């Protein structure tokens, strides 16, 4: 009787062992693909990015000096979903992608300052105080950074509303979290951060206040370029003498994206669509005011979710920064800038493509299905089928 029970136990042991072996294989494959697609792929993509080289010597005709280089990252249009729009899985997926991309970039590239060019949130224009607090908490978790890295943010239309939706409460709510700073100087470089939503030019209270602030910034910049101690500038501290870098959400006026090119430019069928002033781009008048008041050497903007490079007046370059989120484009990216008081060089760093990640997942699912069916004898092993076919050909 004991021998019969022992034999019965051995007969059941082999199927259990085979099932355990299959389960371990499935778990190992799933773990490996999750590790690669959710973590390692970001290191693989961003590891290929390097800070661009920039000339670090400046000469005033008499002597040559070595200038400090500021490493700055520029990204735009993160569009964190709120409580109304978007499926929870969409929110989870896109926010995880941005968090991993940002944290990986911080670790590998070690920037000194990061600028986000508006539309931080998707529903800031209508979110309740409770929803706003939740959105801010998620943003601060996703874009957490060491104390030695500065994070600067400008407002976009989804953060405070389009001009007709904007009000003092929304603007102050945004500035309470992200500061109302308009002028930021570091390592001899001036950055002017503009609330471009408030440049409608219709004399609204917020618009008038914004223009007054910009005129004051213009005055300070002009004083920095004049002889030290000028009577019209007063006794206060002077800014660095370098021409500023202008940062805003709306692009300066351009007719369309017809002259834009590159793999992350707008789709070809959309490039000739005319832009609406104060909706897609700033008005022609507001753009001329900014260029006249600030005399920037470089402009960076967001809003369009696509890349474009244009030159205003043939001399002032503007770069539209593509969206940082998979929700807005399949191939998100950010800009890396090596900037000195007299020069700058920019390069683009591409994040993993969403379609590549989805193809990997679909391929692995197919592989696991084939592996499972083969294991239970429901599908002939492709390897064995190949050997049998090869054997038949040899016998002929």
From Swiss-Prot:
Designated gene of the protein: MPPE1
The protein, known as: Metallophosphoesterase 1
Subcellular location: Endoplasmic reticulum-Golgi intermediate compartment membrane
Field pH dependence: Optimum pH is 7.0-7.5.
Membrane topology: Multi-pass membrane protein
Residue numbers binding a divalent metal cation 1: 119, 157, 249, 303
Transmembrane segments: 27-47, 356-376
Species of the source: Homo sapiens
Listed GO CC annotations: endoplasmic reticulum exit site; endoplasmic reticulum-Golgi intermediate compartment membrane; Golgi apparatus; nucleoplasm
Effect of residue 305 to A: Affects transport of GPI-anchor proteins
